[in-house]
Amino acid sequence: MPGMLTLVKGSVAAAIVSTVALGLTVTKTTTKSTYQGKPIDMVTLKNKNGIELTAISYGGIITSLKVPDRAGKFADVVLGFDKLENYWADPPPPFFGAIIGRYGNRIAKGKFTLGGKTYTLATNNPPNHLHGGNKGFDKQLWTITTKESGEGSSAIFTRTSPDGEEGYPGTLQVRVTYTLTDKNELILDYHATTDKPTPVNLTQHTYWNLAGEGSGDILGHQLTINADRFTPVDTTLIPTGELASVSGTPFDFRQPTAIGARIDQNNDQLKKGPGYDHNWVLNRKGSGPEFAARLRDPQSGRTLEIATTEPGLQFYSGNFLDGALTGKSGKPYARRTGLCLETQHFPDSPNQPNFPSTILQPGKSYDSRTVVTFSAK
């Protein structure tokens, strides 16, 4: 029933507000966890089919996403922690489930020139800048609001990135919306405006394992990427500027292919990963969300399909997971036990004029949509 509010007391929360509408529920919680003295909010979206997403105000992190297999058995398919404090531990985890900004992916040597001025950013992935810097959007507190709409139940994350934050020019107003629908869609909407020209490239850094987090590696997952070309990288994982054909290479995922089938081939680009950590140039015809990728776990039948308005997709095969982190299952996250599919503009675009521009101008808005659809068969 639209607009029905329920107040509940819980052991892990100071307050819970739940809204129920059209078979969907959205629950916002103030947890007992704090970051730098500030409480962490948590939101849960659930659809009529039982799919359930949980996210927190720190980094907009998706901490849990439970989807069914072909037999109707649910599993949490995203890597993460039970204890929220682990998300802001020192050293920090590798961007599990977080909103990435102001610029997702790498900027060469932490520098770019805009309007005749050179801006210097943190080289937090030496010698380059990665995912917005030392304290990017993944390490910031966001304000969460909730709403019901014709599309579904939504959690809306907002924050103001001040002028000069992590070296970027301009005050950026940012809104990221997670919407769960009864069609088993997770819709990711990104919106931003600025008062000065600035690079913007927002994405989401969930690590997927469709067999269930903690279940082992993802090498048997079958991946399809709708791309005829990719952007080769140098030894520091910065694009060379070339748009190379995937034909005859381990980067050809135009047909469903097991991730492990070619990942260790004697290929110069794979050695630089080591493994997959590259941007694919998506085949696009229009301006709306178009098919980008499909990921399937043959054993469980769980499948996700991605459509996006973005021109690129970064496929990262979890090469640097090393077993040092223990996940929700109580099992260590070893190498390649999760993978990322990050919809995006291309890496290092501010320094590569032949790539689609990522410069947002005052008076314009940054708007991007990615739709992740879950199924099992």
Where are these regions (language model features)?
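Bacterial N-terminal signal peptides that target proteins for export
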Residues: M1-V12
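Bacterial N-terminal signal peptides
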Residues: S11-A21
